[in-house]
Amino acid sequence: MRCYKCFRPKEFCLCSFATPQIDAGVKFIFLMHPKEAKRQRTGTGRLAHICLANSEILQGLEFSQNTRLFDLLGDEKFLPVLMYPGNDAWNVNDENFVKLLLPKNSEENKNEKNSASAISTRKTLMPIIIDATWFCSRKIIEHNEFLLRLPKLSFAKNYSSIFTFKHEPRPECVSTIETCYYLIKELQAAKIVAQNVDAEPLMTIFKKLISDQLRAENERVQGLRPSTHGYDWKYNKIREIPNF
């Protein structure tokens, strides 16, 4: 039996860690690759979604005909940005990025990025996050080159993932749920998101996922659970469970 909200086995349901939902005043959109949708054992996009109020998951490989996505992109109350690294990517400290958050008719606010009037008239930031492996992320970009025409946003700082049982292609690569967490923290530092927003549930549920997964893998190695991997050296030794 699976939970139909977090899509994890009932035994390992994580929904209780997602309440109350985080309302950061940001609309997160997750473009979830079909393979990621099937890998709910360790996927973090759905966990991020159930933690974040006003977030949406759009599943697929080809999004050029996705009416929901284009309705969102065409809504002037949102500022859509693609969370994607690159030399042309902004970060939250970039003045040009901050100015984009202001409506075109708010010239008087453009030099007052943290004033009450500027904050009250800001557009809602809408980060678009590709939820997939890095290989599948490239496939989504290949099939949807229009995404690269969106403003790109990346981190102002470097972060390392705590996803201990996954090997990212580069040290600076982080999971979907970590992306949401670090983005909210940087937006708070830039005074774009309110200081009283608590983003910690994202990391709490993520750490619980890691601990549960490693504990289950260790039980398989010990013969306490049926193995689903056959013989694979990655899954035939006891792993240390981090003390977060």
Give the predicted meaning of each segment.
Residues 1-27:
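Cys/His-rich short segments
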Residues 14-17, 39-44, 94:
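Short, glycine/acidic-enriched capping/hinge loops at junctions between secondary-structure elements
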Residues 27-70:
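Extended interfacial segments that mediate partner engagement and assembly in macromolecular machines
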Residues 35-36, 62, 88, 155-160:
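Short, acidic/turn-prone active-site loops that include or flank metal/cofactor-
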Residues 44-46, 96-99, 140-147:
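"Short basic amphipathic alpha-helical interaction patches in structured regions
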Residues 53-138:
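S-adenosyl-L-methionine/SAH cofactor-binding core of RNA-modifying enzymes
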Residues 126-127, 134-244:
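C-terminal folded domains that constitute the principal catalytic or ligand-binding module
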